[in-house]
Amino acid sequence: MGGEPGIGKSTLSLQIALAANGLKTLYVSGEESAEQIKMRAARIGIGNDECLIYPETLLENIVAQIAEHRPDLVVIDSIQTIYTDLLDSSAGSVSQIRECAATLLKYAKSTGTSIFIIGHITKDGSIAGPKILEHIVDVVLQFEGDSNNIYRIL
């Protein structure tokens, strides 16, 4: 899912993770602390004991947590903050996004785990990163506001 900064991607994704009653979920945040996420969850009034919050950006640690907890649903917030030690480039680079997304895709396919990836957008409104990112996922959602910023459009 992509969208402008502040449009509500993280909040909507957290709502999805928390509302998945009966499903074990792992919410991985590369942008906020666990405390910040818990405060947002309290504000939106949804609780789920089966939702684990994991603030992390190193892909290898994220995959280890996924393997350890075996969640039904994983939320990655956001793909541009995740990096692997296998590459010398910085998080958010085309090569990092490609490698991290490919690793997550491989894990999802081998285990049946659903992975929801949040991505930033460029100034022209397209998903930031390699175009291949849009081709390896099952669905691309664009989250936008209306002209008055009253409503959100998915």
Over which residues does each language-model region extend?
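Conserved inter-motif catalytic segment of the P-loop NTP-binding fold
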Residues: 4-7, 11-103
